[in-house]
């Protein structure tokens, strides 16, 4: 076999390999393009399904609201008609209406009204209770100067002559607070203001954090922070 024959035979073989590789590349690219088209169609279909579900839910909700409005209007109309009938017959409508109430209904109504009244007063009661506790706490921290008290008491008894006017002249002068008492009052006010500002800053810091998983997680983390701050 000559070189020309071998060359003629070899060229077609190389050409066939190129054609095969090209067809392989084309088939892979076609498949990728087809997958991309299917993926887009799937996404569009899911989007349309969600929109249709939302529209259906919205329509059902609107129908439910309209149905409730119609039922309420119907009940009001029936109640008004019963009231007019009672007036024409000369009956007491309120008394007649109460006949349909059972003992359980009356107990539920009384319980509901009592709870409503407690809720309205709870805010003022809580604030008053907090103020009372703070006042008692400050009083418990005060130190009584018995020595000064005894001195003032002895001075009053020594100058006491049975005349109420003279006693009234002595008491205002003797009850003047000392510089130490005045400084202690100022210090207590400053400490109370600092505590109040600290609580406000802590509350602002808590509101700034939005990374809590849920309310239970928030309470747990705040409790840990308080323990670390106290330690």
Curated annotation (Swiss-Prot):
It comes from the Eukaryota. GO terms for biological process: mRNA processing; RNA splicing. One of its GO terms (cellular component) is post-mRNA release spliceosomal complex. Residues 151-168, 211-224 have a biased composition (Polar residues). The keyword Coiled coil applies. InterPro entries: mRNA_splic_SYF2. Disulfide bonds: none annotated. Residues 30-89 form a coiled coil. Residues 1-30, 144-231 are annotated as: Disordered. It is found in: Nucleus. Signal peptide: none annotated. Keywords: Coiled coil, mRNA processing, mRNA splicing, Nucleus, Spliceosome. PANTHER family: GCIP-INTERACTING PROTEIN P29, PRE-MRNA-SPLICING FACTOR SYF2. Associated with the spliceosome. Involved in pre-mRNA splicing. Belongs to the SYF2 family. This is Pre-mRNA-splicing factor SYF2. It comes from Debaryomyces hansenii (strain ATCC 36239 / CBS 767 / BCRC 21394 / JCM 1990 / NBRC 0083 / IGC 2968) (Yeast). The lineage of its organism: Eukaryota, Fungi, Dikarya, Ascomycota, Saccharomycotina.
